[in-house]
Structures are given as C-alpha cells and as structure tokens.
Amino acid sequence: MIKKIGIFVLFFFATIHANAQLQKQTINNGWKFYYAKASKWYAATVPGTIHTDLLSNKLIADPYFGDNEKKLQWIDKENWDYKTSFTVSHKILQQKNIELVFDGLDTYADIFLNGKLLFSADNMFRQWRANIKPVLKSRNEILIRFYSAKNKVDSI
C-alpha cells in the first residue's frame, strides 16, 4: 500500500466566497500538475492525490501490482506544482469581501494567485482562507507549490 507520508494533494474544494449574499464558486476543473522529470504539465484531478494523477497519466506503474510500490518511494521526496485558471463574473468582482477557501492542503504548500503569494500552508487538517479582493481579476491563475513533507521533516 502507498505510504500515507507521501504528498497527497488534497483540495477538497477550492472555492471563492463573496459576501453580500454569499456566493460560492467551486474551482475543481482544469487543474494540471508539473512533473519535473518530464519538464511538462499533465492533467490532474482535484480533489485527488499526486499518486493517482501520476498513475492516470501513465507516469508510474500500478503501485498495487507486485513490488511496484517499492519503486515509487521517490514520489514523497519531490515537490509538486498544481495550477488552474478560472474566471469570475463582474458581479463577484464588485463584492466588498472575496475569499479563496481551501479545505485540505497537504501539508506544506505556498499558494499563489496571479503570481502573488497569498499564504503558506503547514497543516492539512484545517481550512485555509485568504482575502483575494486586491489581486482578483476577471481571468485568474492559481498556482500551488506543494513541498515534500518528508524532506521538511528530515531537515528539522
């Protein structure tokens, strides 16, 4: 079985909340992840994990077959970038308060919106919120850089 220590990229829901009458826009389509060994972006499923994304793109062998899991121990030692683009309506842009909300970022990650660092996450077991009103545009890009939890812990 794949070790739970690996980088499990879990975005249960990345959403935008705009106040007034609460409006919610779920951002779980169009995600891609960057595979450094191939210097290429690949399709990703959010919510999901890096292991399932690598498997669905045929970049790793089935970890449940034979001793393949032993050959996949490198995955939790890598950093992984995930990104997507999304648009918001003029109505949302006019709202006074707009937040980006993540339920489950595993574990160490920097979150960027339109190239600006919003926050750094260090705990998967909480909700993360950021005021995005100052950087939100009609067309936007989120980039999430996940750092190897194993490497972080080993460096302490």
Stretches found by the model and what they are:
Residues F12-A14, G48, N57, K71, ...:
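A subset of signal/propeptide-processing and intrinsically disordered low-complexity segments
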Residues N19-D67, E141-I156:
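Accessory carbohydrate-binding/adhesion or oligomerization-edge regions at the termini
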